Amino acid sequence: MTQLETRTEPMVVNFGPHHPSMHGVLRLVVTLDGEDVVDCEPVIGYLHRGMEKIAENRTNVMFVPYVSRMDYAAGMFYEAIVVNAPERLANIKVPKRASYIRAIMLELNRIANHLLWLGPFLADVGAQTPFFYIFREREMIYDLWEAATGQRLINNNYFRIGGVACDLPWGWLEKCKDFCDWFGPKIDEYEKLITNNPIFRRRIEGLGVIGKEQAINWSLSGPMLRAAGVPWDLRKVDHYECYDDFEWDIAWEKEGDCYARYRVRIEEMRQSLKILRQACEMIPGGPTENLEAQRTVEGKKGDLSGFDYQYVAKKVAPTFKIPNGELYTRLESGKGEIGVFIQGNNDVTPWRFKIRAADSNNLQILPHILKGAKVADIMAILGSIDVIMGSVDR
């Protein structure tokens, strides 16, 4: 008796660019063989706004408000890297107090970034309840930002070459300590609700596995790299700002799957709380912007034509001239390594301003880890990468 053989034709399906689970206007052209993913082609560029060219036609103080719109979940990180590049090129020293304030803002942003990742990721895999919890905690961080900078999520415009825009208001550090005391037990609640949930673990364990060598070869960074067994964190490696003053550990796992990436981000929130508590206790006194302080001491009749006095934080001109030279500077954001390659030519605007977005690099490995996966796993794997398309497309 002959047995009938069935032959399936591959089917091409478009996910996005306006799918509710796409984490932005990302389009995936997926080739399916039944329920199995055969191929995947990401289509990006829907949010391209020419940020690098805008940077090359703006002074630094004019460009800082732009960058928080690239990655709205990591605005402080991009503000920091945009001012760090000309600072290092011009060898400008940042006061210790300003460095501590920067570290506090960056760690608050790291927690807010991971919370914004956690809620939608759990919603992608079917857990709706934590989505509402994370916004409760993020609102407290936004309240702290609003008290210090005047804005909540984006357009904080707080970082300046040589320091920060203004000092912290009276009582702000106590409020930050209260947040740390309140948020610590909330992470325990998340873990009790999520981490050992058998449905959640069976849903994502073993999904999207990335090996150690593969992560290095694809230039992954952040939780994507650390979840693959590489304990690499630029706060420890590059010793920028004042992170050497604090005691904290690098969060990393060995499995390299979606569950490992979840564990890394949960532990990073705990480590950020540890850094915040130490920074609030150890923050020194002194000026928050050395250029403003020196100008005040000199008075109106002082020599304002020198290098240190070219930058006026509250006005566009006279402004800071970026000296001749080029360098690449980087820092560890919630998504990984973000960096800026700057080339100055002794002008108020840079000759070249190249931005490296962490999620742009991390997204490149998506087609390779999707091959062989099921259709239902596409959103879980994509969600574990943590992608914001504003910074991917720039």
From Swiss-Prot:
<dbReference type="GO" id="GO:0031676">
    <property type="term" value="C:plasma membrane-derived thylakoid membrane"/>
</dbReference>
<dbReference type="InterPro" id="IPR022885">
    <property type="entry name" value="NDH1_su_D/H"/>
</dbReference>
<comment type="similarity">
    <text>Belongs to the complex I 49 kDa subunit family.</text>
</comment>
<dbReference type="Pfam" id="PF00346">
    <property type="entry name" value="Complex1_49kDa"/>
</dbReference>
<keyword id="KW-0618">Plastoquinone</keyword>
<dbReference type="InterPro" id="IPR014029">
    <property type="entry name" value="NADH_UbQ_OxRdtase_49kDa_CS"/>
</dbReference>
<protein>
    <recommendedName>
        <fullName>NAD(P)H-quinone oxidoreductase subunit H</fullName>
        <ecNumber>7.1.1.-</ecNumber>
    </recommendedName>
</protein>
<dbReference type="GO" id="GO:0051287">
    <property type="term" value="F:NAD binding"/>
</dbReference>
<dbReference type="InterPro" id="IPR029014">
    <property type="entry name" value="NiFe-Hase_large"/>
</dbReference>
<keyword id="KW-0813">Transport</keyword>
<keyword id="KW-0874">Quinone</keyword>
<keyword id="KW-0521">NADP</keyword>
<dbReference type="GO" id="GO:0016655">
    <property type="term" value="F:oxidoreductase activity, acting on NAD(P)H, quinone or similar compound as acceptor"/>
</dbReference>
<dbReference type="InterPro" id="IPR001135">
    <property type="entry name" value="NADH_Q_OxRdtase_suD"/>
</dbReference>
<keyword id="KW-1278">Translocase</keyword>
<comment type="function">
    <text>NDH-1 shuttles electrons from an unknown electron donor, via FMN and iron-sulfur (Fe-S) centers, to quinones in the respiratory and/or the photosynthetic chain. The immediate electron acceptor for the enzyme in this species is believed to be plastoquinone. Couples the redox reaction to proton translocation, and thus conserves the redox energy in a proton gradient. Cyanobacterial NDH-1 also plays a role in inorganic carbon-concentration.</text>
</comment>
<keyword id="KW-0472">Membrane</keyword>
<keyword id="KW-0793">Thylakoid</keyword>
<dbReference type="GO" id="GO:0048038">
    <property type="term" value="F:quinone binding"/>
</dbReference>
<keyword id="KW-0520">NAD</keyword>
<comment type="subunit">
    <text>NDH-1 can be composed of about 15 different subunits; different subcomplexes with different compositions have been identified which probably have different functions.</text>
</comment>
<dbReference type="GO" id="GO:0019684">
    <property type="term" value="P:photosynthesis, light reaction"/>
</dbReference>
